[in-house]
Each structure stands twice: as C-alpha cells, then as structure tokens.
Curated annotation (Swiss-Prot):
<feature type="transmembrane region" description="Helical">
    <location>
        <begin position="258"/>
        <end position="280"/>
    </location>
</feature>
<feature type="topological domain" description="Cytoplasmic">
    <location>
        <begin position="112"/>
        <end position="123"/>
    </location>
</feature>
<feature type="topological domain" description="Cytoplasmic">
    <location>
        <begin position="1"/>
        <end position="12"/>
    </location>
</feature>
<keyword id="KW-0997">Cell inner membrane</keyword>
<keyword id="KW-1133">Transmembrane helix</keyword>
<dbReference type="Pfam" id="PF00528">
    <property type="entry name" value="BPD_transp_1"/>
</dbReference>
<dbReference type="InterPro" id="IPR035906">
    <property type="entry name" value="MetI-like_sf"/>
</dbReference>
<feature type="topological domain" description="Periplasmic">
    <location>
        <begin position="36"/>
        <end position="88"/>
    </location>
</feature>
<feature type="topological domain" description="Cytoplasmic">
    <location>
        <begin position="176"/>
        <end position="204"/>
    </location>
</feature>
<feature type="topological domain" description="Periplasmic">
    <location>
        <begin position="228"/>
        <end position="257"/>
    </location>
</feature>
<dbReference type="GO" id="GO:0015423">
    <property type="term" value="F:ABC-type maltose transporter activity"/>
</dbReference>
<feature type="transmembrane region" description="Helical">
    <location>
        <begin position="205"/>
        <end position="227"/>
    </location>
</feature>
<comment type="function">
    <text>Part of the ABC transporter complex MalEFGK involved in maltose/maltodextrin import. Probably responsible for the translocation of the substrate across the membrane.</text>
</comment>
<keyword id="KW-0813">Transport</keyword>
<comment type="subunit">
    <text>The complex is composed of two ATP-binding proteins (MalK), two transmembrane proteins (MalG and MalF) and a solute-binding protein (MalE).</text>
</comment>
<keyword id="KW-0812">Transmembrane</keyword>
<feature type="transmembrane region" description="Helical">
    <location>
        <begin position="124"/>
        <end position="143"/>
    </location>
</feature>
Length: 296
C-alpha cells in the first residue's frame, strides 16, 4: 500500500510540475515573441523566435533616434514614444498617490467611525464600481468639456482632467484598505489616545505605519491600471504630444500601416515602469494581498 501511495504521489507531483510549466509557457511565450519582433528587420509580425539578422532600428526609433537606411535615406522617429512614456509615468504616479491618499482616509472613516448610512454607502460604492467605465464615456466627455470652461487644467486634452477622471474608481481600493484596517486592533489607537495623541496623530503615527503592505498593493494595482488604460485616455486626450503610451501605441497599427516592430519596441518600453514599481514594492505585495481580504 505504501508503494502504491508513493507512486501516486510521484505522479501527482509530476502532473503538477507539467501543468505549471505549461502555464508559465503560456505567459512567457507571448512576451518572448514581442521582444523578438522588436529586434527583427522590417515590420513583420511573423517569424522565428530568434531573429536571423537582429536589428536595433525599432529600438532607435522608439528612443527618438533617426535610422539611416542602406540606400542612404534617413527615417526619423514616427512618434514621440519617450514623451508618451513620460506622460504615462507622470499620470500613473500622480493618480496612484492620490488614490492611495483618498482611499486610505475614506477607508479609515468606514472602518473606525460610526455614522448613519455607512453600510448603504459602502454597498452603493461597490455597485457603481461594477459598471465599466466605457458606459460613462459620453457623460465623461460632456462633463470635462464643461469643467474645462471653468477650470482649464481639468478640461479636455489635459493630464489634470485625465487624473481627475481616474479618481472616481477608488471604491474597490476603499473596500480593500478597510478590510485591512479592521484586522488592526483598536487598542493600539486607544493607547495612543491615552498618551495624548489626537485622532489624526493616531491615524498617521500608529495606523499608517502598520498599513504599509496594503498601501503598497493599492499603489501598484492603481499604477498598473492607469498605465494600461485606453478608453478614457483616448477620449479625453486629443493632442499627440499629450497621449499616454497605451493610447499612442495605437498609432502604429493603422490598417494601411502596421508597424509591428516599432509597436513591439514601444510595448516593451511600456512594461518597464510597471516592472520597476513592482520590484521596489514586492516585499509588501504578498502580505498586503493576503491581509487585505481578511476581516477581523
């Protein structure tokens, strides 16, 4: 019996390993293909995983350098990719910081304070968050068109307006941080109050330091969401130099002009900010994700 169980366990371990490798292959293979396309000559979507004649022409164009062709002609960069990348980092960074600030203070109110209608407001926030932003595109355009007449830096074709529009999607983050706050014992804040701390001091000096993991998670999720967001950004931004990278990359794929190599190089560049932010905050990520869903 022991031998049978040992063989059965061995087969299950092998089956698990095979399934994991298959899953990893499904994730890694598209990434390798994108990298390979960015190093191929010409703008072709098909070809071998390892280019026959690797070329840096697409990367030079993406980084803003002109390329001299074999016939002596010069190809200038078709689009300001680095400007788009900076716009993405700027919008995503500011939006994520503001989302963390608003979500944290709102979650504290829902987790610690008692007021009439608290549960109703929480449920309403979650219900409204379930509707995709695409349903509100017409309303958003009309709203920011009107808002720009009174506050120009929050109107159409402004990064301020785009950031402001993203702040409406904090309901899920409020719920996540609220769940984390509820795992922290109230006695810590009560002890701080006995030592003479005001509610704001207890929140800032006691609760926030203990909440760094979940705040890092919210920042990362917000950053990733904004960097890859297209519908709202493409609606509110009309100037090419104001585009975020996710919106600008669509310029490479017009029906009469599929620049797959340039598109692939820009796609790899778009992953760099997300990767850097993730690496800087990864030590808090696992703990924040697991604790954020626990209610004490």
């Amino acid at each position: 019996m022991a031998m049978v169980q040992g063989k059965s366990l061995k087969y299950r371990v092998w089956a698990t390993h095979i399934a994991l490798w298959a899953f990893l292959s499904m994730i890694i293979f598209p990434l390798l293909m994108i990298v390979a396309i960015s190093f191929r000559e010409g703008n072709f979507a098909t070809g071998s995983l390892i280019p026959d004649n690797p070329s840096l022409e697409h990367w030079k164009l993406a980084l803003g350098f002109s390329v001299t062709n074999a016939d002596g002609s010069v190809t200038p960069p078709p689009f300001p990719v680095l400007t788009w990348l900076w716009n993405s980092v700027k919008v995503a960074g500011i939006t994520s910081i503001l989302i963390v600030a608003l979500s944290t203070t709102s979650a504290y109110a829902f987790a610690r304070l008692r007021f009439k209608g608290k549960e109703t407001i929480l449920k309403a926030m979650m219900i409204f968050q379930m509707f995709p932003a695409v349903l509100a595109l017409v309303a958003l355009y009309a709203l920011f068109d009107k808002l720009g007449q009174y506050i120009p830096f929050l109107g159409l074709n402004t990064h301020g307006g785009l950031i402001f529009s993203y702040l409406g999607g904090i309901a899920l983050h409020v719920w996540t941080i609220k769940g984390y706050f509820e795992t922290i014992d109230n006695s810590l804040e009560e002890a701080a109050a006995l030592d003479g701390a005001t509610p704001w001091q207890a929140f800032r000096l006691v609760l926030l330091p203990l909440s760094v993991p979940i705040l890092a998670v919210v920042f990362i999720l917000s950053f990733i969401g904004v960097v890859g967001e297209v519908p709202v950004a493409s609606l509110l931004l009309s100037d090419v130099n104001s585009y975020t990278l996710a919106v600008g990359m669509q310029q490479y794929l017009y029906p009469q002009n599929y620049l797959w190599g340039d598109f692939a190089a820009a796609a790899v560049l778009s992953a760099l900010p997300i990767t850097i932010v993730f690496l800087l905050a990864q030590r808090w990520l696992v703990g924040g994700l697991t604790a954020g869903g626990v209610k004490g």
